[in-house]
Amino acid sequence: MLWELLFIVLIVLVGAFVQGASGFGLGLVVMGFLPFMLSVQESTLLVLSFLAATALTILIKNYRSVQLKGLIMFVVASFAGRILSFFVLTTYGDMDILKTWLGVFLITLVVYLYFNNKRNVSLKKINKLVPISLGVLNGFFGGLFAVGGTFLVVYCLYLYKEDKHRYTANVQIVTLMTSSFSLLLHGVNGDFDLSFLLYFAVGVVSVIVGAVLGLRWFEKLPASMIRTIAMLLVLLAGLNLILFS
């Protein structure tokens, strides 16, 4: 049990640091490793709670930059995706095959992020289907694997590419809203137990410390460097999930 708690502290600390410094990444980093110890459902619920805590910590500093205009359709679509993922997770969340699917999805995201960083997409190309489709994807994969933030980041980069403070603030407010919604659904369904409370109590300390440290580096360290390191970790974790789950 002691080693399990130390493991959670370490990976959550790294994930929260990445989230604080670059705006996203906690879900990717932690979900790449936590399923080695817990089921996918248990891992997802923990990471969703950590995401909500991290987002709230970051928002305390950046709340003045929140501007939800342009995100309403995205958020509504995300809620729809969260409802769908809730039924999938509660039905298949304890199956080991879901860990393999998670590994494949993580590697796919890493490849997508690598090539997407080389492209420069204009906001003028966005139509109404973009926030709806990205919102549903964010909601579904965020609720299923707690790693849907990539779709949120892509959309917010379109909207706030010239203002990194507004970008990170709006990513966090949407993350807080959608994560809290998923946790509410699972809470009503009775999916939490005492072990969850123990893991959360230990991990939330790492969340706060990691997010605060990440925010300090937010102004100094290139976000691209932090994301690159995080993506390498996620790539290795995804391969491990496929090969050894």
Question: Which residues does each PLM region occupy?
Answer:
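Small-residue-rich hydrophobic segments that form or flank transmembrane alpha-helices
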Residues: 5-72, 139, 147-204
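Small-residue-mediated transmembrane helix hinge/kink sites in multi-pass secondary transporters
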Residues: 32, 86-90, 154, 215-216
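Hydrophobic alpha-helical transmembrane segments in multi-pass integral membrane proteins
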Residues: 43, 85-89, 140-147, 182, ...
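Loop-to-transmembrane alpha-helix entry segments
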Residues: 67-73, 91-106, 119, 220-228
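Membrane-interface helix termini and inter-helical loops of multi-pass transporters
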Residues: 86-98, 120-123, 186-198, 245
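Membrane-embedded helical hairpins/re-entrant loop segments and their flanking transmembrane helices
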Residues: 108-168
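Interfacial loop-to-transmembrane junctions
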Residues: 212-234
